[in-house]
Amino acid sequence: MALAATGCMSRGESNNSESSTTADLEISVSIRGSEAPTKSWTLHCPPGGTLPDAAAACSKLGQIDDPFAPVPEGTACTQIFGGPEIAAVSGTFNGKRVDTEFSRGNGCEIERWKRVGFLFPGVS
């Protein structure tokens, strides 16, 4: 999925703290149209898993309202391309099922990617 470079979404900061954030996530990033290997991580909150700096990731996730929400249907988005990467996130977050993809195919998707970009280390 594509990274959103413009502020198409208006989701604020959450009152959650790292200690109240629970997650059991599988994260992968692949490059559309490439034979490059897929990069994969796990994230568990309380902090654990293979994602670098899991403690910071748990803390950041706890500060974002609905970090895995899709771009609302009907949203007008700028038509810019942010890159061929596609990120998939699945598992549970704060007791809710997560099964979503992120891309950088338009401005809204770029912004959505940027909100949780810390989950995709090494992907610019």
Name what the model sees in each region.
Residues 7-12:
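Bacterial signal peptide processing site
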Residues 24-28, 42, 88-90, 99:
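Beta-strand secondary-structure signal
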Residues 1-6:
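Sec-dependent bacterial lipoprotein signal peptides
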Residues 76-124:
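Extracytosolic low-complexity repeat regions of secreted or lipid-anchored proteins
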Residues 17-33:
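Post-signal peptide N-terminal segment of mature Sec-exported envelope proteins
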Residues 22-24, 38, 84-86:
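Extracytoplasmic
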Residues 44-89:
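Mature extracytoplasmic domains of secretory-pathway proteins
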Residues 28-50:
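N-terminal first-folded block
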